Amino acid sequence: MAWPCITRACCIARFWNQLDKADIAVPLVFTKYSEATEHPGAPPQPPPPQQQAQPALAPPSARAVAIETQPAQGELDAVARATGPAPGPTGEREPAAGPGRSGPGPGLGSGSTSGPADSVMRQDYRAWKVQRPEPSCRPRSEYQPSDAPFERETQYQKDFRAWPLPRRGDHPWIPKPVQISAASQASAPILGAPKRRPQSQERWPVQAAAEAREQEAAPGGAGGLAAGKASGADERDTRRKAGPAWIVRRAEGLGHEQTPLPAAQAQVQATGPEAGRGRAAADALNRQIREEVASAVSSSYRNEFRAWTDIKPVKPIKAKPQYKPPDDKMVHETSYSAQFKGEASKPTTADNKVIDRRRIRSLYSEPFKEPPKVEKPSVQSSKPKKTSASHKPTRKAKDKQAVSGQAAKKKSAEGPSTTKPDDKEQSKEMNNKLAEAKESLAQPVSDSSKTQGPVATEPDKDQGSVVPGLLKGQGPMVQEPLKKQGSVVPGPPKDLGPMIPLPVKDQDHTVPEPLKNESPVISAPVKDQGPSVPVPPKNQSPMVPAKVKDQGSVVPESLKDQGPRIPEPVKNQAPMVPAPVKDEGPMVSASVKDQGPMVSAPVKDQGPIVPAPVKGEGPIVPAPVKDEGPMVSAPIKDQDPMVPEHPKDESAMATAPIKNQGSMVSEPVKNQGLVVSGPVKDQDVVVPEHAKVHDSAVVAPVKNQGPVVPESVKNQDPILPVLVKDQGPTVLQPPKNQGRIVPEPLKNQVPIVPVPLKDQDPLVPVPAKDQGPAVPEPLKTQGPRDPQLPTVSPLPRVMIPTAPHTEYIESSP
């Protein structure tokens, strides 16, 4: 039976009296019922027949408890009666049952006189008896001394005997009376002063102790015990009484028993008392003792805990190295270190730690100083963009510088991520060319450039104004951007303002030239921003502000880059982003400025928005709106199908831009990546055609995306408005941002996008018209980028380190 804990030995071992007399039904502990009756406290129980009367003797409660739960054989009937007898086979059972029934508890014992045999219960219990476990180990009440003498010393004590510490005056070199060998000692009493055990014996090893123990048992426990307790003075007598000398004797000071003497010693002792008197004998004995001590027979603390000198130390096994470095020399350069090279990596320099450290130190102290490889222009590119108000011309130079710088940066970054940077570089270069071509077209746009140029270089200033303009056009968006771009707001709003209000148109008007410029501007930023966008959405979602800045900065190059980059950027953009991010970092200032007007205000709103949108749509938007037409139419076519999905997605996406845009972007990225590549290139370059086409495309996309725009516009419309104003492309990015960034960027861009979104929803209506389509497309265009955003996102990380200060600081407002 599986009884609970009560039956465990630990419980069974408790005092039986307490167990039995407890008023709880512990008797489960008993394995056989008879045990219940054999209380240690109760008088010896009579045989079962009388037993039933007997139980009264036991304390009633205990009796009742014991009996009720597991009655003894004698009491089974009583239990049966108590429980209410089942009609018994014999007539006796019934009469007995009566009394039992009346008093189930204490009355049990007094109950029936009937023999145990008559009860049905008895049969039941008999059946139990069959299964009864082995007889219980419960101690019997009376103590039966065992035949073997009681061992007073427990095994524990034997195992942990006190060490045989020598007595204070015990010096082995001082002659002591020799101990007599077993034979002689048995015959004659010891003569002379009681001799302490020789040291060899005092320190006798445990084996000896064990032997002694065995012997101790033989001669007689009492003698051994007495000897153990005997004091030194009595030792003689004890020994005499005890019998053979080797009976274990516990010398008082020595914790150890005396054990049979070694043969040599026995001989010495055999010589008898005479020998004991002689000094020679003592010397011999001591010599013997010393030998024995030396022979490790002795045990003492010194010996016991002696270092194991004779054991050879284990020869450590050298584990085979798990990692076998490749035979060819390892390149200890990470993509990170490659990116932040102080100088162009010279093979020898790489190994020179001092130079390397100096390079890194300078890198961190002057993070924007790019390696010679990268060309300082990139550094300057960011600053000139900020500082130079030379608008388009400087912008051109800046774009070139930024692009070259970015290209260089990308080259440096290419070491770490070759493919992405390459794409970025190529796309940037292409974008630069496109941007330059547009710039040449847009040279007149210089003015616009001023309008947008401010966007480019003075964007902060212009953008300040632009924002108001943007505020007008992008007002809603800009206003939030105002917050982010607060400073930017004052100047650019004017520029962008008109641009933005009309951005589709104004941007057209602004774009007309600026569009050209913007195409370049946007194209570069678009590029970067395209990449930025992807990143920005990611980066921008976090970095939105930064991105905005970055994007702003990105936009300049990105616009250029992005023109092409849109195509590549979609591809490159993801990769580009890192570089763009880097570029953007530096570019941020300029870009922010460059696109600042457009982007800055938008950057923040549109920061994300501008980048991509800036790309295709930035340039494309004004003219590109037309431009984007083709692009859009192609993308829209590509994306239109996508758009429908994306529109749905994007509408959803706008709402849940990330979702849709993620998906939308994917497709759009694909389509627009493809489409954009062509269109972007074309768009930047072909802006006119595409613009026209895009216009139609936009319109159609608007239709396709119109729905999307509405939702997207709703979500992204805000973006779109900004984008519309800033740039269709911008819209794209916001879609990105919105798709991606919107959730997060919305945070950063929330001020930018969300508020602008809200404001721009109104704006959206206006921009939505032209750019609604453009936006959708940009959404799509950027949508595609969005997909890449994921790809870019890692890159954004790279980016973050580079331009983080600018991005975060500037955009943090």
From Swiss-Prot:
Q: Which InterPro entries match?
A: MAP6 (IPR007882)
Q: Where is the lipid attached (S-palmitoyl cysteine)?
A: C5, C10, C11
* UniProt-annotated stretches for the region Disordered: 36-283, 314-651, 756-813
**Gene Ontology CC: one annotated term:** microtubule
The UniProt annotation puts the region (Calmodulin-binding) at 126-140, 162-176, 189-203, 306-320, 357-371, 384-398
Its keywords, alphabetically, are: Calmodulin-binding, Cell projection, Cytoplasm, Cytoplasmic vesicle, Cytoskeleton, Golgi apparatus, Lipoprotein, Membrane, Microtubule, Palmitate, Phosphoprotein, Transport
Which regions are flagged for Gly residues bias? 100-112
Q: What is the protein's given name?
A: Microtubule-associated protein 6
The species is Homo sapiens (Human)
* UniProt gene name: MAP6
